[in-house]
A protein has these predicted regions:
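Kelch-like beta-propeller repeat domains
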Residues: 1-171
């Protein structure tokens, strides 16, 4: 990477590019994106689109062939958990917030994991776990047809003690 960063989020796009978004450098929180690609067995790094806001601990996933999604995270500038769901339109080359998407149903969070997952014949962005003043045990998916986040379940069995685990990671 060109910029050292921690608490960033990354995803592999259908074209094989590896996008790294946000995070914290040695001196500040970032809203930059770096794109790594390998061609002819050689890594190249280029700058990607700037995010709408600087975030750490957000999740980033492919939503469709033409859209990427950022959900959650923490904004030190706003000194709060992010209430936003930002969509990057690859065809238009810009970020926007869909007005119909409320923040994650069970509350904003940092350090969650999200991934694009096949539900029957449709793909959904699934977000799991994370932290909002306590470890979160809920898993949700974004349903663009219903225009909302849908709770899939909790990450513990009824009657068993709740595990306080917050920091998940996927790749």
């Amino acid at each position: 990477m060109k910029t050292p960063r921690a608490y960033a989020s990354a995803a592999v796009l259908p074209n094989g590019e590896f996008w790294i978004t946000g995070g914290a450098s040695r001196s500040n929180v970032l809203r930059t994106t770096e794109i790594l690609s390998i061609r002819n067995e050689e890594w190249t790094i280029r700058n990607g689109p700037k995010m709408p806001r600087a975030l750490i601990g957000h999740c980033f996933a492919v939503m469709s062939e033409n859209e990427l999604v950022i959900a959650g995270g923490y904004s030190p500038i706003e000194d709060d958990y992010s209430q936003n769901v930002d969509i990057y339109d690859m065809g238009r080359g810009k970020w926007y917030t869909k007005p119909w998407i409320p923040m994650i149903k069970n509350g904003p969070r940092i350090d969650s994991s999200c991934i694009n997952f096949l539900f029957g014949t449709e793909r959904r962005v699934v977000i799991a776990g994370g932290w909002n003043n306590t470890a979160m045990e809920v898993t949700e998916y974004l349903d663009p047809n219903l225009q909302m986040w849908v709770t899939m379940g909790r990450n513990y069995s009824q009657g068993e003690p709740q595990q306080q685990v917050g920091f998940l990671s996927t790749f």
